[in-house]
Structure formats: structure tokens, C-alpha cells
């Protein structure tokens, strides 16, 4: 049996990866390692918690002694590393925590893996350290066509109504790093440490950089679940600046599928970009969410558009992200399975049908954070 640690497995993307691996590979023992910070929630994995090939361990990746003990106790063959502080707004207020978790936590995990794997007779043979990162490490692309031009490429994730790009450049695996926020700087540093462990010690590593994800179980500090919840309760929808910033959106289950494929078929020391060729201005995706929520709640279409409230822009707010994922499609055959409008429909339905989950994660400390972030802007 292969023993795999998945860090951050109680979080948004991590829980989808854990669920996929536990259900798809009964011959794998999946060890879900999560600190259970505000964004980690074991309720995300209730449906698999009793599976015989699943184990949960509460722990902090910054705890090197614990990481080494877990490697030894579970005889870990592979690591899929998703644990991270990931919200840009929080990184602006508390960059130290982001550096501690994302940089030092990754280094702790790398060093523990190095010590354990090098102690084995076979060394690194058959081992893999797969590090999941973000497109934000590349910086920002110019929005040379604010009115939109026909997208040069599409995937099934692309909108059937919005085949537009807002510039001619896209992030490639060879794009130079140029992080602009404390969050992206911390992720860029962790990416470099992972590659350095391959170049220096021969550790078998892979890095992937993904575009914005959406879907079930996302903590509602992020745009789509935040707005679904606010629309439901007819609360203001805080939009940074003019809402013109552009992001490439991918359904989280398709990201998990890509991680599965890259883990099994990806080449060691390679980087793969994961995206959907699905660019949207923030204001446009907000309007889609409003119309979808209103329709599913039986309200007149667009009845809640007046909830849009423009607030002071985020410091250092990157204008446009857009991923070119053709390398992954060409070399490994991955493509998204869900078209954008289908994904939004499924996402809105899930949050509306799981209000208890939303109520549980938006109580207490989250409410204090929300009030602090948006009440005075």
C-alpha cells in the first residue's frame, strides 16, 4: 500500500483532492495533515471519514519534529502539499504569518522528507513531492483590451457566453516570477525552495500553478461564496475599485482531477500551469452570481444588483491573471470536465442547500474579520 500525505486536506481544494484519492484509490493510504485553522473544516470530509484507507492527523507543517515523525511512523512514499495561508487581504495585514506557514512550513516539510527518504535503502526511488502553487507568483498581465477580444484558446471550462480575453499575453510555465503581494511572495519563495531541493539533493519534485478556483466548501472570505451568502441575506456586495480586475476561473473538482493526473503522470522537475482559458472581470462574474442566486431563490432576475457596493481598492491589486495550460493538455491529456455556467450553477446550488455549513463557518472569528475588512471601506 502506498502511503501519501496530503497537507491542507481539510481546506477547500485539499478536501476535494483527499476525497478523490480516497475514493478512487483504495490501495492508497491517505494521511490528511491539517492544522485546522479557520479555513480547515473536517465537516468537508464527513462522507469519507470512516473509510479504511483514510487517516486524519492534526498538525502544523511548521513543526519539523512532527513532520519527521509522521514521515517515519507512516513510512510516507509521497507528499501532495496544499497547506498554505492563501487570502491576499489577510497577507496584507499579517505578512509574517504567511511567510511562516508558506515558506518555513514548506521548508520544514521538505527537510523532513529529505531526511526520511535519504535514510531508506532505495533513497528517492519511487518518491514524489508535489507542491501546489498559484498563478499569482507570476505577477500581473497587462489588460491591453479592456473591452475584450476573442479568446485565442478555449477549453470546456470556458464560458459559452464569454469567450473573451482581455489581453494577448498569458502566463506560461516559463514566465518569470514577479509577485506583488505578501501572499504571492511567500508562495513564490516556497516554489523556489521546492525546486532547490530537486536541484541540490535530487528530490523528485513537481510544481503546479493554478488559476482561481470556485466550487463547494470554499471558505466565504473568497469572492464567489462570500457573494452567494451576502445575496441570500441581502447584504452589501463589496467590490474592489471598479470591479475591472480580471481572473481566470476553474471549477475545483477539475483542479483536483488535474492534480490526480499530474501526480501519476507528470514529469519530475517539471512545472505545469492549470487553468481554464476562462477570463472574467470581477464585476461581470458578480452579476452572473447575482442572477443565478436570484433565479434559484425565486426572486426576479437581477433583483439584487443594487447590493453591489464599490469599496476602496486593495493595495497592490493585480489587474489581470490568465493561464495558458496547453502544456498540461498536450503532454498529459487533461481538460476540464465542467463548462463554466454549469459550474456556477452547481456551486450556487450547493451553498444554498448547505446553509448550516455556511452558518458554522461564518460565526465568531469570521464575523470579526469580515467587519474589520469591509465595514469602513
Task: Show where each model-derived region lies.
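The catalytic Tyr-centered alpha-helix of NAD(P)H-dependent dehydrogenases
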Residues: 179-186, 216, 220, 224, ...
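Intrinsically disordered, low-complexity segments enriched in polar/charged residues with Gly/Pro
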Residues: 74, 84-85, 170, 215-216, ...
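C-terminal substrate-binding subdomain of Rossmann-fold SDR/epimerase-dehydratase oxidoreductases
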Residues: 4, 17, 30, 59-62, ...
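Short, well-ordered secondary-structure micro-motifs
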Residues: 43, 142, 218, 250, ...
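Residues at alpha-helix caps and immediate loop-helix transition turns in enzyme cores, especially N-
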Residues: 41-44, 94, 219-223, 285, ...
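Short histidine/acidic/glycine/proline-rich micro-motifs that form metal-
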Residues: 36, 97, 212-215, 245-246, ...
Amino acid at each position: 500500500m502506498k502511503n501519501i500525505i496530503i497537507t491542507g486536506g481539510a481546506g477547500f481544494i485539499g478536501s476535494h483532492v483527499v476525497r478523490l484519492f480516497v475514493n478512487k484509490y483504495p490501495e492508497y493510504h491517505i494521511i490528511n495533515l491539517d492544522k485546522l485553522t479557520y479555513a480547515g473544516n473536517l465537516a468537508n470530509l464527513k462522507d469519507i471519514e470512516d473509510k479504511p484507507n483514510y487517516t486524519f492527523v492534526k498538525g502544523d507543517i511548521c513543526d519539523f519534529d512532527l513532520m519527521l515523525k509522521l514521515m517515519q511512523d507512516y513510512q510516507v512514499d509521497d507528499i501532495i502539499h496544499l497547506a498554505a495561508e492563501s487570502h491576499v487581504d489577510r497577507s496584507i495585514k499579517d505578512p509574517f504569518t504567511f511567510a511562516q506557514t508558506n515558506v518555513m512550513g514548506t521548508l520544514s516539510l521538505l527537510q523532513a522528507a529529505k531526511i526520511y527518504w535519504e535514510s531508506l535503502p532505495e533513497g528517492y526511488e519511487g518518491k514524489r513531492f508535489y507542491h501546489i502553487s498559484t498563478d499569482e507568483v507570476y505577477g500581473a498581465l497587462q489588460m491591453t483590451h479592456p473591452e475584450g477580444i476573442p479568446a485565442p484558446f478555449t477549453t470546456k471550462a470556458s464560458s459559452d457566453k464569454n469567450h473573451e480575453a482581455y489581453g494577448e499575453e498569458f502566463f506560461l510555465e516559463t514566465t518569470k516570477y514577479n509577485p506583488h503581494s505578501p501572499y504571492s511572495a511567500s508562495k513564490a519563495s516556497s516554489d523556489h525552495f521546492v525546486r532547490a531541493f530537486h536541484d541540490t539533493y535530487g528530490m523528485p519534485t513537481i510544481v503546479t500553478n493554478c488559476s482561481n478556483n470556485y466550487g463547494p466548501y470554499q471558505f466565504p472570505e473568497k469572492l464567489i461564496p462570500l457573494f452567494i451568502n451576502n445575496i441570500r441575506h441581502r447584504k452589501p456586495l463589496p467590490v474592489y475599485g471598479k470591479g475591472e480586475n480580471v481572473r481566470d476561473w476553474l471549477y475545483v473538482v477539475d483542479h483536483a482531477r488535474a492534480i490526480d493526473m499530474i501526480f501519476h503522470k507528470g514529469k519530475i522537475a517539471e512545472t505545469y500551469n492549470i487553468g481554464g482559458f476562462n477570463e472574467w472581470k470581477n464585476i461581470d462574474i458578480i452579476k452572473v452570481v447575482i442572477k443565478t442566486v436570484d433565479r434559484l431563490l425565486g426572486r426576479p432576475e437581477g433583483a439584487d444588483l443594487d447590493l453591489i457596493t464599490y469599496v476602496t481598492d486593495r493595495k497592490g491589486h493585480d489587474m489581470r491573471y490568465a493561464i495558458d495550460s496547453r502544456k498540461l493538455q498536450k503532454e498529459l491529456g487533461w481538460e476540464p470536465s465542467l463548462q463554466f455556467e454549469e459550474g456556477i450553477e452547481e456551486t450556487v446550488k450547493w451553498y444554498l442547500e448547505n446553509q448550516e455549513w455556511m452558518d458554522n463557518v461564518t460565526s465568531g472569528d469570521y464575523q470579526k474579520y469580515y467587519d474589520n475588512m469591509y465595514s469602513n471601506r
